[in-house]
Amino acid sequence: DLTYWGLGATDHLVTAWIALSEVNVESGCMQFVAGSHANQILPHEDTFADNNLLSRGQEIQVQVAEEDKTDIVLRSGQVSLHHGRMIHGSGPNSSEDRRIGFVIRYVSPDVMQEVAQKDYAMLVRGVDRARHFVHYTPPPSLFAPSHLALYEEIREAKKQAMMAGASKSSTLYD
């Protein structure tokens, strides 16, 4: 993940993937490669493949043996945590049900956006002395106009970070 987020090779970040539906091998659960978070950032290739849901169709350029992968099977409401350098991915959903998840990234305030002009975060604890992020608060109501405009600003900043250096554009941000 750190390869294309524009946040550098930080250890001060963790991703929480919250299952909102059952997630198993048949539905294409995530797979982790144990210990891979200790690697440096690995080279990726932008495939822009139709069957890859990532913004650039990013794929790491290393071969991972099947026996090194661990299936992360979750029941609805369970959470998995992973480091931004953890090799991870998922296969296709071949079940009759949807695979639904929600992602939250916890980032220390000392982390800094390196490729986009700015980045946004919601402070959840403590004090941000570094001030590397534009802070925002939860919306006051559903579809509040001020926060819909803010959403568009955040989306544009994410596009700038995620697509920096890409050879072509992505429809993800259209």
Give the positions of each predicted feature:
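Short, surface-exposed loop/helix-turn segments at secondary-structure junctions
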Residues: D1, S55-A65, E96-R98, A116-L123
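Non-heme Fe(II)-dependent double-stranded beta-helix
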Residues: D1-G8, E45
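Short, structured patches in soluble enzyme cores that scaffold and shape functional sites
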Residues: L2, I18-E22, A34
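Short clusters of hydrophobic/aromatic residues that line enzyme substrate/ligand-binding pockets
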Residues: W5, M30-F32, V124
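Short, conserved beta-strand element in jelly-roll/cupin
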Residues: L7-V25, V73-S76, L81, I104-S108
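Conserved catalytic motifs of the protein kinase core domain
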Residues: L13, G28, R99
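Double-stranded beta-helix
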Residues: V25-G91
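Non-heme Fe(II)/2-oxoglutarate
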Residues: R85-I87, G91-D174
